[in-house]
């Protein structure tokens, strides 16, 4: 079944996303957590026991790894705060993962652009060669 079939799970995921986003911006003081950290998506299991939080960090690979490490170390505090603010029997265990889909998208765009430019250059060169060959025949 799709996630749309479970509106309670979706509502809980959105609420967790809002709470943790606010905490990252205002409450967490861990210097390892980059200021430019965004929550991309939160997936909560149907039994509401686990929540996977996908984050994006603006920075180099070291900053990304440090941010994930800082969030993992702070997960107990974050979970306690989430549990205080949501109305659920259980507070899901929080699993932080780095979402690299944006970087992959940029990389794929660059690859496609390079291939397209190469094709255009080759077509231009072949057209010029054909034109010069036609002039020589005249």
Swiss-Prot record:
Coiled-coil ranges per UniProt: none
Main location: cytoplasm
Disulfide bonds: none
Domain of life from the UniProt record: Bacteria
Pfam families in the cross-refs: RBFA
GO MF annotation terms: ribosomal small subunit binding
Any single Gene Ontology cellular-component annotation: cytosol
Chain spans, region Disordered: 119-138
InterPro entries linked to this entry: KH_dom-like_a/b, RbfA, RbfA_dom_sf
Keywords: Cytoplasm, Ribosome biogenesis
GO biological process, one term: maturation of SSU-rRNA
Location within or outside the cell: Cytoplasm
Function per UniProt: One of several proteins that assist in the late maturation steps of the functional core of the 30S ribosomal subunit. Associates with free 30S ribosomal subunits (but not with 30S subunits that are part of 70S ribosomes or polysomes). Required for efficient processing of 16S rRNA. May interact with the 5'-terminal helix region of 16S rRNA.
Family the UniProt entry places it in: Belongs to the RbfA family.
Quaternary structure note: Monomer. Binds 30S ribosomal subunits, but not 50S ribosomal subunits or 70S ribosomes.
Stated name of the protein: Ribosome-binding factor A
Gene behind this protein: rbfA
């Amino acid at each position: 079944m799709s996630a749309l079939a479970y509106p309670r799970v979706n509502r809980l995921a959105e609420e967790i996303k809002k709470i943790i986003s606010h905490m990252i911006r205002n409450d967490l003081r861990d210097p390892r957590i980059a200021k430019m950290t965004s929550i991309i998506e939160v997936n909560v299991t149907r039994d509401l026991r686990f929540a996977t939080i996908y984050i994006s960090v603006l920075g180099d690979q070291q900053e990304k790894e440090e941010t994930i490490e800082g969030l993992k170390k702070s997960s107990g505090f974050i979970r306690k705060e989430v549990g205080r603010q949501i109305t659920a029997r259980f507070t899901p265990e929080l699993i932080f993962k780095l979402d690299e889909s944006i970087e992959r998208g940029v990389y794929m765009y660059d690859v496609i652009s390079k291939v397209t430019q190469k094709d255009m250059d080759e077509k231009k060169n072949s057209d010029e060669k054909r034109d010069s060959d036609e002039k020589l025949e005249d």
